[in-house]
Amino acid sequence: MADTLPSEFDVIVIGTGLPESIIAAACSRSGRRVLHVDSRSYYGGNWASFSFSGLLSWLKEYQENSDIVSDSPVWQDQILENEEAIALSRKDKTIQHVEVFCYASQDLHEDVEEAGALQKNHALVTSANSTEAADSAFLPTEDESLSTMSCEMLTEQTPSSDPENALEVNGAEVTGEKENHCDDKTCVPSTSAEDMSENVPIAEDTTEQPKKNRITYSQIIKEGRRFNIDLVSKLLYSRGLLIDLLIKSNVSRYAEFKNITRILAFREGRVEQVPCSRADVFNSKQLTMVEKRMLMKFLTFCMEYEKYPDEYKGYEEITFYEYLKTQKLTPNLQYIVMHSIAMTSETASSTIDGLKATKNFLHCLGRYGNTPFLFPLYGQGELPQCFCRMCAVFGGIYCLRHSVQCLVVDKESRKCKAIIDQFGQRIISEHFLVEDSYFPENMCSRVQYRQISRAVLITDRSVLKTDSDQQISILTVPAEEPGTFAVRVIELCSSTMTCMKGTYLVHLTCTSSKTAREDLESVVQKLFVPYTEMEIENEQVEKPRILWALYFNMRDSSDISRSCYNDLPSNVYVCSGPDCGLGNDNAVKQAETLFQEICPNEDFCPPPPNPEDIILDGDSLQPEASESSAIPEANSETFKESTNLGNLEESSE
């Protein structure tokens, strides 16, 4: 495959995370020749989403990754006298302390297959009692005896769309498209609902159903392609930088979104819904009439707090938590503002930080729905793929499973000249963007990383029952003691195309102080109970039951300055992995900053040209983007219940 690649590009991007994908799209849109490579077999890096079997394969890859022994660098012969090489790392050390627990009944048989699976490695199919299964499913831990796990591995990592789970709104049934991960060195393909219907037979939903409330592990395996499990758990602020970029660049046409329907609070051992809009506040039965007036008055002030500096003068240096106590708010209102609206730390957030966060929350209300947040159908892993698709449309070349052995640096200028790939091909470029996980240890010896604690749960019911079982919720559980951090809980229903019917996908996230399980297990125990056969028929069980759980720590390199990396060439730019924040603003800011260094004074991801405005002048095309091209046209196949950013933007403004 190497001889088919051109030998020279303007920009080479290594890694397909969200920041790298945005930069690749922006550079390609600006006319640069872009090569975008990743040694992984899937798009997104630590921003990726996986089907259930794909996630198990990912876990196995990380176990095998820890056993990699560096080979003798055969590319050294290609390094000239006036050059030196920076060997890139083959080990990804961004994920640690992985632990998997399976609570669902493990009546797994060898003939159970994932619906729509294209290829299976039978050597990796194991029985429920096999200790080999646990070893292949997660990295060894000190407490392996607590984790029983059986798994069916597939060599494919491809999540799929589900035309059967068509969304319904006002009686109208509609379907949409799902963009698949690539398994080879090709550009991002899209798969239509009609194509996917061949892989996921409609008859699957009408076959034998398990008895009420009983979900087995084999059923999760069989329905594994209905899961799209994110490695990083985030939401999109409706007026955040990423939404604005999606609309501006017209990349929004490649994705669909759903509104977060509920904001929840956990108080005195109970989960309750929090009012956040004006209508919610005045319709709330949780607040007294006096509290409603107090809350609306305070929120009105927060919307324009910069105009009234006297209101917070002298309080700038204290925490937002202490400031709220001075505002004559009841403890109930203080809790709601602190943990469900501002969503800031009681100990680490200043008054100004809290006021900014509250204003941002209120500013995003009402643009697309009753809450400030959106979630992409099929998971966060769709977003990097959307920008990769834009890059490919404008000529970018994509190669997955394509390792870069080293960066070639000129000794005199201290600039990077080229890369040498796994086939020994030298590829020249002017600019290089590298995801930080590819850098060797000697280059990162002065870097101090933070960690993110993550948990992913598959449960059988929502944390707060309502008439509808299709709720998407966010809940913040405050820190219990000094030195720990608040835990963010995002619960996704099956209409988000991230889990099978009858289940919920729950993501827990916090800044790490210990291992992920140590940080998050206490919150899990407050909200959920393990699934056991004895409780299946017990209708008095109030908490959701955990069918399957995954804990892991992920590196957070978002605040690392490039000066912390040793001997970094001036034309090599570092892209960090996900941060612990709820939104994606950090990734967008990083991408725009690096783009301006590569392409100064050029527009960042401008709208694509309207085909009607393209003027043919000799052999050159001179696209002129009309105003209307910045807002996507309605698609006849788009989800009506989900959010089309362009359409709603058009109607709301």
From Swiss-Prot:
Family that this chain belongs to: Belongs to the Rab GDI family.
Connected disease: Choroideremia: An X-linked recessive disease characterized by a slowly progressive degeneration of the choroid, photoreceptors, and retinal pigment epithelium. Affected males develop night blindness in their teenage years followed by loss of peripheral vision and complete blindness at middle age. Carrier females are generally asymptomatic but funduscopic examination often shows patchy areas of chorioretinal atrophy.
Gene field: CHM
Protein name: Rab proteins geranylgeranyltransferase component A 1
Lineage: Eukaryota, Metazoa, Chordata, Craniata, Vertebrata
GO cellular component: a single term: cytosol
Keywords: Cytoplasm, Disease variant, GTPase activation, Sensory transduction, Vision
Primary role: Substrate-binding subunit of the Rab geranylgeranyltransferase (GGTase) complex. Binds unprenylated Rab proteins and presents the substrate peptide to the catalytic component B composed of RABGGTA and RABGGTB, and remains bound to it after the geranylgeranyl transfer reaction. The component A is thought to be regenerated by transferring its prenylated Rab back to the donor membrane.
GO molecular function: GDP-dissociation inhibitor activity; GTPase activator activity; Rab geranylgeranyltransferase activity; small GTPase binding
